[in-house]
Structure formats: structure tokens, C-alpha cells
Amino acid sequence: MTKGTQSFGMRHNKSHTICRRCGKRSFHIQKSTCACCGYPAAKTRSYNWGAKAKRRRTTGTGRMSYLKKVHRSFKNGFRSGKPAAAVAASA
């Protein structure tokens, strides 16, 4: 058997399986690390040379149920639901 193209047909074992954090088939079984998100590291793996990859999974690509509310309340100056206090007229 040669060490080139013919040998690649002999490969059967999977080196990567599904990652529990990102859901991609990038979790290396022997290394126990994900090639996509870096799991089990606390911080998500991201590099500037992967600008497209960053764009796919950055803030704003999901539901953003809380951040949408924050933007709305920021526009209104973070007012609570109470009516504004009456200001004494100086005459």
C-alpha cells in the first residue's frame, strides 16, 4: 500500500462529532475541543481573519429579545412606567 491517495480510502473513523455548544460537527473527540466555537473554553472562539464567521454568529443574528427592549428604553431616556412628577411653576 502506498502512502498517498489510495490510503485515504482506508479511513473510516470520525475525528469530529457534534458540539454541544454550537451544534456543528466540529468537536474533536481526542482533543476534546471544538474547532468552531472553542468549547470547553469559557470564551467563544473568534478571529479577525474570519470576518464572515464573526458576522454569522455575532450579536444581532438571533432573537435578541432583551436587547431590543434596551434600545427602545434608551431612546426614551430609560423612563420607568410611572408618570412624570409635576414640576412647580415659578411665577
UniProtKB/Swiss-Prot annotation:
Chief location: cytoplasm
Binding site for Zn(2+): 19, 22, 34, 37
Example GO BP: cytoplasmic translation
Entry GO CC: cytosol; cytosolic large ribosomal subunit; preribosome
Disulfide linkage: none
Additional remarks: There are 2 genes for eL37 in S.pombe.
Coiled coil: none
GO molecular function (one): zinc ion binding
Zn finger region (C4-type): 19-37
Alphabetic keyword roster: Cytoplasm, Metal-binding, Ribonucleoprotein, Ribosomal protein, RNA-binding, rRNA-binding, Zinc, Zinc-finger
Listed name of the protein: Large ribosomal subunit protein eL37B
Domain of life assignment: Eukaryota
Its job: Component of the ribosome, a large ribonucleoprotein complex responsible for the synthesis of proteins in the cell. The small ribosomal subunit (SSU) binds messenger RNAs (mRNAs) and translates the encoded message by selecting cognate aminoacyl-transfer RNA (tRNA) molecules. The large subunit (LSU) contains the ribosomal catalytic site termed the peptidyl transferase center (PTC), which catalyzes the formation of peptide bonds, thereby polymerizing the amino acids delivered by tRNAs into a polypeptide chain.
